Structures are given as C-alpha cells and as structure tokens.
C-alpha cells in the first residue's frame, strides 16, 4: 500500500473534528521531515524583522467578530507573519469549510484530520461579518476538502453569491485549493458565481512538489488557472510562490513564465518561514535584491501586477494588489 493510501486510511479511522499539527500531522507524508534544532536553523536576517502594532484594539475587534460568527481566518490558522499588520489595517482572509485540512503539506501550519461536514449557514454568516466590519475587499480561502465530491466548490460559490447580495460593494477574491480529481465539477460550479479575482497558489517549483506539496500536481494546478481564466475572461487570475525551500532563482523564473503561458496576470512571491521545528526547514533567505529582480522580470513577462518581497503573502494587502498599487 502506498504512503498516500496508508495515511488516508489512518485519517479515516480518526474521529471527525480531531485536529493534528506539527509532528503528528507530518508523521505519514511520503518524504519524512527531519525536525530542526537551534543549531541547524538558519538565523533570520534583519530584513525579516516584523514590526509589532502599538495597539491591539483592532486585532481584538476582528477576532471577536470571527468568534461571534464561528468563522476562521487563515491569518490565525496558518500563523501568518503579517497577522498584526493586516488585522490592524482592518483586513482578513477568511477560511471557509472548517479549520481541518485533508492534506499534510509540510510547509503549512493548518491542522490535518477528518473535517466536519460543511456548515450550510457559513456563507450567510460570512456575509454578515463582512457587512459588520465594513470591508471593501475580502479574500476567501479554504482547507483542502478531498472528502467532498466537489472539493468544496459549492461553498465558495455560495459565499460569493451571498456577499454579492448582502455586501454588493465588497470585492471578492477566492484563493482555492486544486480540487484534485474534481476539476470539471468544481469549475462548472464556480463559473456560475465568479469572483473579482481567482487565485490558486503554485507554491514552488515542480521539482519540489513531492517534498512540498504531496498529493498535488504541477500541471493540474496550471490547468486549473488556465481553464477558469478562459471561461471567465473578465476575472483576474492570480498565483503565489514561496522561496527558501530548496529552489533556485532560475526555477522560480521558469514557474513565473509557465503561469504567464497559462494566462495568469497577477503574482505574489514571498519568503517561506518555518512554522515550527517539525515543518520543512528554511534552506535560504532570499535577499530583497532578488525579490526586486523577480518583480522586474515579472513585468517583462507581461504580468499586470507582481508583489515580490520577503513578507509578501498571497493575500497580503490583496486589495492594493488588485488595484495595481505597489506592495512590499
């Protein structure tokens, strides 16, 4: 039995809603992750220092709103380094379909296990929350839901529709999983209620997929972006990459070109940061000059907008990205 099948059967035997993280989460992935120690961890450079906010009032308000509506933010679940800045700015990336993922990507801090059934009232609660916070731009993402026949596509579509009805002035970006084995069904559903921006992250170079994205397929992800873009030519397609996982600058440039060849016009490139000692180690810290080079090359390739910087994340200042403003 393959590692994938073995891990899936072990997950199936666990109680729904039980969440596993760090070493417990990564115990059965195809390529084992060796836990880091202080001696093996690279020291963070000065340009990765994060400014802490002077006040947490805005942060507390957004967290309270999320709790009140039984919602999750990927900012919290994935331990994003920009949480304080984004929450203080009054923006958040909402994570629908629960906080338990069916996959075990070793770069990601989201918990793994058997997810609970989707909540039918989640789209309405999400729209109400947006209206309460007065957000003009929102990013909706999700865990992978390989347990669902549509991969969770209907929940995305319902959220987009509900927000359009309750908060018509709010622009919506969806950051979707790859809908493994369910692309036709998922696209048929998503095309009925398209967002303003369609985002799916490639994450890394194809050479590293078995290590970084076990269960995913490089060409499949490219095809997902291309097919949605062809069906919805007025919708911007977007993707994001991480650096520091063992790739070369040349490989990142090749992925950037592949994305352009598949119709993607918006790009983010940021530094990978290790969530815990049990996750994939950072193999290099990319200098800001290299990020500036990625941005220059992206413009040459024809990207309409590219945000490249050490702390840039896929949904970091997504409102500014969509408006074509500079993001660092």
Swiss-Prot record:
Residues annotated as domain Radical SAM core: 87-304
CC annotations in GO: cytoplasm
Pathway field: Protein modification; protein lipoylation via endogenous pathway; protein N(6)-(lipoyl)lysine from octanoyl-[acyl-carrier-protein]: step 2/2
Places the protein is found: Cytoplasm
InterPro entries hit by this protein: Aldolase_TIM (IPR013785), Elp3/MiaA/NifB-like_rSAM (IPR006638), LIAS_N (IPR031691), Lipoyl_synth (IPR003698), rSAM (IPR007197)
Domain of life (superkingdom): Bacteria
Keyword Iron tagged: yes
Principal cellular location given in the protein's record: cytoplasm
Alphabetical list of PANTHER family matching this protein: LIPOYL SYNTHASE, LIPOYL SYNTHASE, MITOCHONDRIAL
Similarity annotation: Belongs to the radical SAM superfamily. Lipoyl synthase family.
Protein name listed in UniProt: Lipoyl synthase
Organism from which the protein derives: Colwellia psychrerythraea (strain 34H / ATCC BAA-681) (Vibrio psychroerythus)
